[in-house]
Amino acid sequence: MLSNISAGENSEVEKIVVKCSKSGMHNYIFITIPIIYSTIFVVGVFGNSLVVIVIYSYMKMKTMASVFLMNLALSDLCFVITLPLWAVYTAMHYHWPFGDLLCKIASTAITLNLYTTVFLLTCLSIDRYSAIVHPMKSRIRRTVMVARLTCVGIWLVAFLASLPSVIYRQIFIFPDTNQTVCALVYHSGHIYFMVGMSLVKNIVGFFIPFVIILTSYTLIGKTLKEVYRAQRARNDDIFKMIVAVVLLFFFCWIPHQVFTFLDVLIQMDVIQNCKMYDIVDTGMPITICIAYFNSCLNPFLYGFFGKKFRKHFLQLIKYIPPKMRTHASVNTKSSTVSQRLSDTKCASNKIALWIFDIEEHCK
């Protein structure tokens, strides 16, 4: 069994057995997955590069949300630039021609992106919750410095979680076929450590963040529903936006997390069936595509839905240089949020989109 010989997934070479050596080796995988990887690469580089340029050149990272979104775009960029390597790797029937160093770098970039993306999306949901539900109480804490320190902590924790890829990920050459794979190669004595890391990926990398994101946006929806109780159409818009955020996160990541857990069961010999091996090895690259398609959608959802971001984006494509003006800090804006939420003028300016607006003002 070639257990999860694909981008960013666990592979215990010592447990490869001859009777399952063809699991996951299907021609449609070698054709379809590289095409999808290439598509994600093009769209991801384009979308995330625009986010970086707009925030850095026009918005100057003056709010917590803009700092989080900038780091989210940079994290996604670090990942998507490795996709051509994985596309070639898959197209060559899981043969890695790029050497040991790129194997480690590309694999680490994937794990790093997984944790930074999830943690940053969680921080964005908490920031939106604080700004909308507790604008006055959160004013002191919601500063750019706090956001930057939070991002430093996120990158540090994500790197520590990626250390198994740095240490164990390497090329391995099968002597009978001369096939070179990029895999996690470790002794059988380390299996429980690797299983533990996979479970951490399930719990810390998905379940806990999902609960926080779901709770944050549920409370946001409840607050805005009370504010706009008399405006049914507005409530529907807000509700749809919040549901889109939660469902996008859930459906992009849950398939990959389920297959990661199945892989844990395989590593622990709980599952010892070649048919199930084939299902996991075949499905894993597909779930990877679904999960990391999120890297394409993030900038559009969290950036282009914002009114001010769209304005600066249009300036960029029209080659209009950024205006030399001081952007109002979120600290000077938050004191009037409570009044704005009840103001009819702000209601007419699509407050539903304010959930995603990283400059946080309604004019």
From Swiss-Prot:
A Pfam family matched in the record: 7tm_1
Chain sites annotated for binding angiotensin II: R169, Y186, K201
Matches recorded under InterPro entries: ATII_AT1_rcpt, ATII_rcpt, CCR1-9-like, GPCR_Rhodpsn, GPCR_Rhodpsn_7TM
Major subcellular location class: membrane
Annotated localization: Cell membrane
Keywords: Cell membrane, Disulfide bond, G-protein coupled receptor, Glycoprotein, Lipoprotein, Membrane, Palmitate, Phosphoprotein, Receptor, Transducer, Transmembrane, Transmembrane helix
Protein name: Type-1 angiotensin II receptor B
